[in-house]
């Protein structure tokens, strides 16, 4: 068989396939032209029928909504209550007293007992009397050169005390030194102007400064300062002889009142 005959035979075999292909293409083209017409346009299904329906059991039950809702009044609410349901109010409620041996915990729990519990002995006496005296006292302080004060007219003892402290390097301290240092840090220029031009000492700093200057200028004042326990006057006043006799007869052990050095207030 020649080559030309084979080519002609192959063309005859492929011709019916091309005819079938062209016929199917024409059918699709006709369908596409029909879909462009307004009469054949298909709208989207808004009911979602294409979705899978749920079972009736899984659907939630619809609750009807009241059209006219009216809020009940307080009188109507009270009328709906039965008198048998109400009880008396317990005004005398007394809670349980807490105890060291019992610690509150959740319900149905075992009572927890601490290890170290303070128990009173059976033969111990408990004092249940009310204390008449006031046992509150001021902080303890050391009286500097007040226990053995020197008389103002004993010049030899005063000079001896001054020389002894000068050699030992111990000097008397102004009793209101802390107050002086605190006021000194608070004083400003306007306080000096008000004091020197208008004689106004609002903080009391300048009066305290004069007392401190007098204290260090005359050291004998530190060694002859009187006791301040029974002094009801000002701090600059001195004791008299009658006050000394009263001081000697005063019973310090049976008194519960203690006075500070910086004030005349009994505590």
Curated annotation (Swiss-Prot):
Residues 14-25 have a biased composition (Polar residues). GO terms for biological process: ascospore formation. Residues 1-26 are annotated as: Disordered. Keywords: Cell cycle, Meiosis, Sporulation. Residues 1-13 have a biased composition (Basic and acidic residues). The keyword Nucleotide-binding does not apply. It comes from the Eukaryota. GO terms for molecular function: mitogen-activated protein kinase binding; protein kinase inhibitor activity. Indispensable for spore formation. This is Meiosis-specific protein ISC10. The lineage of its organism: Eukaryota, Fungi, Dikarya, Ascomycota, Saccharomycotina. The gene is ISC10.
């Amino acid at each position: 068989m020649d080559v030309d005959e084979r080519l002609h035979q192959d063309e005859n075999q492929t011709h019916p396939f091309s005819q079938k292909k062209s016929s199917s293409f024409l059918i699709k083209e006709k369908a596409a032209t029909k879909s462009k017409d307004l009469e054949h346009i298909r709208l989207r299904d808004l009911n979602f029928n294409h979705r899978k329906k749920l079972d009736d059991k899984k659907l939630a039950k619809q609750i009807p909504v009241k059209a006219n809702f009216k809020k009940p009044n307080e009188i109507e609410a009270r009328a709906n209550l039965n008198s048998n349901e109400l009880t008396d109010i317990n005004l005398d409620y007394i809670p349980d007293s807490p105890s060291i041996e019992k610690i509150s915990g959740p319900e149905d729990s075992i009572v927890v007992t601490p290890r170290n519990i303070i128990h009173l002995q059976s033969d111990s006496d408990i004092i249940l009397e009310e204390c008449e005296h006031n046992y509150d006292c001021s902080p303890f302080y050391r009286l500097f050169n007040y226990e053995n004060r020197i008389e103002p007219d004993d010049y030899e003892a005063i000079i001896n005390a001054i020389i002894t402290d000068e050699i030992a390097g111990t000097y008397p301290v102004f009793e209101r030194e802390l107050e002086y240092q605190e006021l000194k840090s608070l004083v400003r220029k306007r306080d000096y102007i008000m004091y020197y031009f208008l004689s106004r000492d609002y903080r009391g700093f300048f009066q305290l400064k004069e007392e401190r200057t007098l204290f260090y200028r005359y050291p004998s004042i530190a060694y002859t300062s009187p006791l301040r326990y029974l002094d009801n006057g000002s701090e600059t006043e001195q004791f008299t002889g009658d006050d000394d006799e009263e001081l000697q007869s005063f019973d310090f052990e049976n008194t519960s009142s203690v006075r500070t050095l910086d004030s005349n207030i009994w505590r």
